[in-house]
Structures are given as C-alpha cells and as structure tokens.
Amino acid sequence: MSQRSAAIARTTKETDISLKLNIDGEGNTNIDTGVGFADHMLTLMSFWAGFDLDLKCKGDLEIDSHHTLEDIALVLGQVLSEAMGDKKGINRIGFAKVPMDEALVEVVIDLSGRAYLVYDDDILPPIIAGDERDVWREFFKSLAFKAGMNLHIKFEYGRNGHHLLEGAFKALGLAFRNALSVERQGVSSTKGSLD
C-alpha cells in the first residue's frame, strides 16, 4: 500500500496554516494553533487515531478563535481526503463511545464521500475554554464537509464542557482508526466506488 499522507499550506487574510498528516503514523503530534484548548483536542484525536499530525496556524485571534478553528478544520478535512487516496481496502465506517469522567460521547463516521453532520450540542455549556460552543459545531461541520464524511456526534450525558468535547475528540480519533483500517480487498461499497 502506498503511503497515506498529505500536506497543505493555506494562507488567507484570516489565517496562515501549514498541515502535514500521516494516517498510518504513531500518534505523534507537533501542534501550535494559538488556541491551547484546540491544540489539546487535536493532540487527543491524533493519538487515538494513530495519526502523525504536524500543524501550525497563525490566525486573527485578536478578533476571536472562529476563523482559526474553522480554517484548521477545512485544511484538516482536505488533507485527510487527499491522504485517503482511492480508499481501497478501508473499513469506511468507524464508531466509538468514550467516557470522560461524568460525560459519555458517541461518534460514528462513514468515509463514503457523502458529507453530512449530525451534532446536537444543547447539552454543552454556552462557553467552553473561553469559546462559544457554536465554534465547535462549525469546526466539525467544516471537517465533515471538506473530508467528504458523514459525521454523527452524540453527547449522551455530562456536565463539564471540556469533558464532553474531550470525549468527542477521543471518540473521533478511535472512529478514524477503525474506519481507515485496511482490512478488505477493493472498495467498501456495493456500487464499486466511494465518491
């Protein structure tokens, strides 16, 4: 199998991002987004996915973190899509349920090329680590649509916003590990392609 990795550099008036991803890594990360909580969450996701992720971002944080987090998700989704290549042999579907202290979160993904997000964040507090909870909905939406994946995140219960999001990122990492595992011959689709 060819190496499943990709890299992108993207500069706009709002952000300057460079991102390298190796799907078949060891969970090693070098992340500096300027948003400490995001660094923590992306490190957790990468560890549980087994991704090697090198990410640098300089964003317009003097405004807020919205552009930074949304653009990181767009670039991560694009790099993930490129690194997956033709998707031959992958399981395609992955899922995980993760407890984090009082919180329980389930994530289910389908790397079918059909982008969709199901994300009910009513349980999340309005502010998490200094950011409005809506910024995380935009993060996951941008990731799902740019990666071409169906992403369901279910916050089953919990009180602490940090714990709920940490559970989501860990579960997403485990779901990626499962979905990207190569265990089949050909493409995981009765129609013969994933696009």
Curated annotation (Swiss-Prot):
Keyword annotations from UniProtKB, A to Z: Amino-acid biosynthesis, Cytoplasm, Histidine biosynthesis, Lyase
**Cross-referenced Gene3D superfamilies, in alphabetical order?**
Imidazole glycerol phosphate dehydratase, domain 1
The protein's annotated catalytic reaction(s) are: D-erythro-1-(imidazol-4-yl)glycerol 3-phosphate = 3-(imidazol-4-yl)-2-oxopropyl phosphate + H2O
Kindly list the places in or outside the cell where this protein is found, as annotated in its UniProt entry: Cytoplasm
Under the heading PROSITE patterns, the entry gives:
IGP_DEHYDRATASE_1 (PS00954), IGP_DEHYDRATASE_2 (PS00955)
On whether Lyase is a keyword of this UniProt record, the answer is yes
Identify the EC number(s).
Answer: 4.2.1.19
InterPro entries, per database record: IGPD_sf, ImidazoleglycerolP_deHydtase, ImidazoleglycerP_deHydtase_CS, Ribosomal_Su5_D2-typ_SF
Any one of the GO CC terms: cytoplasm
- What's the top EC group for this one? lyase
Tell me which Gene Ontology terms the entry assigns under biological process: L-histidine biosynthetic process
Any GO molecular function = imidazoleglycerol-phosphate dehydratase activity
Pathway this chain belongs to: Amino-acid biosynthesis; L-histidine biosynthesis; L-histidine from 5-phospho-alpha-D-ribose 1-diphosphate: step 6/9
Please give the family membership noted in the entry. Answer: Belongs to the imidazoleglycerol-phosphate dehydratase family.
Protein name, as recorded: Imidazoleglycerol-phosphate dehydratase
What organism is listed for this UniProt entry? Answer: Maridesulfovibrio salexigens (strain ATCC 14822 / DSM 2638 / NCIMB 8403 / VKM B-1763) (Desulfovibrio salexigens)
User: Where is the organism placed in the taxonomic lineage, from the top?
Assistant: Bacteria, Pseudomonadati, Thermodesulfobacteriota, Desulfovibrionia, Desulfovibrionales
